[in-house]
Amino acid sequence: MTEIEIGRGKRGRRAYAFDDIAIVPSRRTRDPKEVSIAWQIDAYRFELPFLAAPMDSVVSPQTAIRIGELGGLGVLNLEGLWTRYEDPQPLLDEVAELDEAAATRRLQEIYAAPIKEELIGRRIKEVRDSGVVTAAALSPQRTAQFSKAVVDAGVDIFVIRGTTVSAEHVSGAAEPLNLKQFIYELDVPVIVGGCATYTAALHLMRTGAAGVLVGFGGGAAHTTRNVLGIQVPMATAVADVAAARRDYMDESGGRYVHVIADGGVGWSGDIPKAVACGADSVMIGSPLARATDAPGRGHHWGMEAVHEDVPRGKLVDLGIVGTTEEILTGPSHTPDGSMNLFGALRRSMATTGYSELKEFQRVEVTVADAQHKR
C-alpha cells in the first residue's frame, strides 16, 4: 500500500474507518428471507453473528442469558461489579446518576474492591444453568490467577480481552502470560484480542486462538486515542487482520481463525461494513447499552475508564432507545441505525445479492468522499 509523506523524516499509511467506506450494490438482489446470518465458532452456532462486549454497562448475568436466548453470545466481565460485589445493583444505580465530568474518580473507587473467586463461579453458573452458551472474559494480567475458577465453573468460551494484547509481552516486573501454552492446555476455545495489525494478528493466530478480536482505541466510551495517541481505523484494521487469517490458513494447512471486529461498531451500517472487510462477527457495546434492560440504564463505560493510573475511557450517557430484542432484531422505530441491527445486516446482504456471511466478505466496497459520509 502506498505510503503518504507526513514530513521529511516520516511516512505513514492511509487508513480507513467504517465511516470512510461504503458497500457497492451488485447486479443481483435477493429476498431477505433467503439470507442466513448465522455464525459458528468451534462447536457453537449462533443465529446472530455477534458477541456482547464484556462491559458492566452492557452485560449482566441476566442480560447474558437474554442475549443468548435471542441468538447471540453475551460475554461476562469477570473483573467487573458482578464479581466484586454480592449485589452490585445499588452501585449501578449510583453510576447512572453520576455527572460525566466527575465520574472517573468515583468509578475508580468502586472498582477498587477485590475480585472474589467465589463470585466468578457463581455468575458463570447462573448463566450456564439457563442453557445458553456461556462466555466470560478476563484481562491478560488476571487470566493466570483466575482461569482455573473460570474453567471449573463450566465456561464454554474463554475470552482474553485487553486494549491491545500481544503474543510477545515483555515485563521485568512479572512473568507474562504464555498465551500459546495457556491455550494449548485449555479444553475450551479461546478468543483473544485486541489487535489491529497484520503482524500482531498473525502472532495471536499462531497461539491456537479460535478467534481474534480486532480493534483498540475505538468505541463510544474509549479515549485511548486522546490519552495514548494510539488508534487504527477499523476498516483498515479488519482488512489487515483478515489478510493475516488468509496467510495463516496457508501456513497452518487450513486452520481457520475467526476475525471479530471489536470497536467502531456503533450503528447497524457498521456491521455489514465490518463483514465486507473480512470480519466473521462483531463485538457490540454501545448499541446494547441503549437497551431498556441494560445494566447501565443508557450509561456506558468500560474497564479502561477505571484504570488507577491512566484512565483511557469515560462514562457516557447514550440514552435509551428500546429493548434488547428491538435493538438486535427489531422492529425498529428509529431511522438512525440504532435498532434492528441484524435485520439491517440481513437486508444489506439481500440488497447486494448474498445469502451467506462468508460470501458477503467478497462484496465490493468503495472509499466514500467526505460529502457522502454520515
Language model features: what each stretch is:
Residues 1-252, 258, 288:
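Active-site entrance/lid segments in N-terminal catalytic domains of soluble metabolic enzymes
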Residues 1-27, 111-115, 122-125, 187, ...:
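Alpha/beta catalytic cores of nucleotide-metabolism and tRNA/nucleoside-modifying enzymes
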